[in-house]
Amino acid sequence: MKHFEANFDGLVGPTHNYAGLSFGNVASLSNAALVSNPKAAAKQGLQKAKALADMGMVQGMLAPQERPDLYTLRRIGFSGSDANVLKQAAKEAPMLLNACCSASSMWTANAATVSPSADTRDGKLHFTPANLVDKLHRSIEPLTTGRILTATFSDPHYFHHHSHLPEHNSFGDEGAANHTRLCNEYGHAGVELFVYGQEATNPNAPKPQKYPARQTLEASMAVARLHQLEEDNCVFIQQNPDVIDQGVFHNDVIAVGNQNVLFYHEQAFLNTQHKIDEIKRKLDTELYFIEVPTAKVAINDAVKSYLFNTQIITLPSGEMVIVAPTDCQENPAVFAYLNELLTLNTPIKQVLYFDVKQSMQNGGGPACLRLRVAMNEMEVAAVNQHTLMNDALFARLNLWVDKHYRDRLTTQDLADPQLIIESRTALDELTQIMKLGSVYQFQR
């Protein structure tokens, strides 16, 4: 049976804007108040997804969240007509309105943690939506995320869906952005690397001082239990608190893995060698640990260019390729390193560059935009086929974006009642295109 690693990219929502909501994310804060282009953002994401599909990769799309989120605004006391709710919130609590209009669900690396059937005791693919409790604008996503995932991976014979973890900082969970999987072949049992920022229940353990550690060890261990993983399938690694304080808010900003390759910065982890030894003990295959020295790429350059927020994919030919943002080309140190990497004795043979600047300016590169799902061909056949990228879906979604999306949006525009109508009309049509059913609150 054939096995693949599918990528499910987040479709950028109609309210994509730059409100600077993500403390600890340097790009998000530094680009606050820029004028965004939702239409361009959605099309950049679709172009990347289609390019991977054209390379023979299994590529899907995940629908965005409903925004503005009027249900949350009503929960916190704003009332009256929909237009009045927006008007009140804009006047009395503009930052709360901004949080309820964020298109951050485009970064599906934070949608959930996924464990493939080759690793789990019941032989099913497991999904746990991330609770994202550290950021208000993301903490309102998990229920809808769960519905979208269930509508996409709907066959209970193959897919096991869990609820998100308790909504408390002790179980702060940011999903696949702090999780990667090493293996020989995608269909073979592998080792899942759970990277955490702090131990919530141990006040003496190392933790960052400036920016929050969004992922706890307790959350990572809970997900491993839910997914029925054996101890021999798991390695728990602490991210270096110093790099979190330099803007590395998720592990996928400082490390990325694929099959038998782990590509990471030398400052990425604590106790790096000890953990590499544990991985080698638990995974009996030839492994490539590609450590990038600070002398060649400083942390600041890694964060600005998103060198590690790249995708490493294995093409159907067996060739391993890095999918990088064009920002990596524009950074001399990073571009020089990537050119050098191709001359080294590793499986990575090519770098492909994509323009995802609308996402990058909000702090999300190519790896943020995708949720990885290792699957066999029977599981791929059980996926909602209307979510899988092909020529027809690409054309239809581009027309849908042209029809419904603005090409200019400011934070002041978020109070425009017309945005509610535009967004709901677009999403209602999208659920028909992708055959998702009633996943949104306004449809229920």
UniProtKB/Swiss-Prot annotation:
Record-listed E.C. numbers: 3.5.3.23
Which chemical reaction does it catalyze? N(2)-succinyl-L-arginine + 2 H2O + 2 H(+) = N(2)-succinyl-L-ornithine + 2 NH4(+) + CO2
* GO MF annotation terms: N-succinylarginine dihydrolase activity
* Pfam families membership: AstB
Any coiled-coil regions, as ranges = none
Q: What does this protein do?
A: Catalyzes the hydrolysis of N(2)-succinylarginine into N(2)-succinylornithine, ammonia and CO(2).
Q: Which PANTHER family match?
A: N-SUCCINYLARGININE DIHYDROLASE
Q: State the protein's name.
A: N-succinylarginine dihydrolase
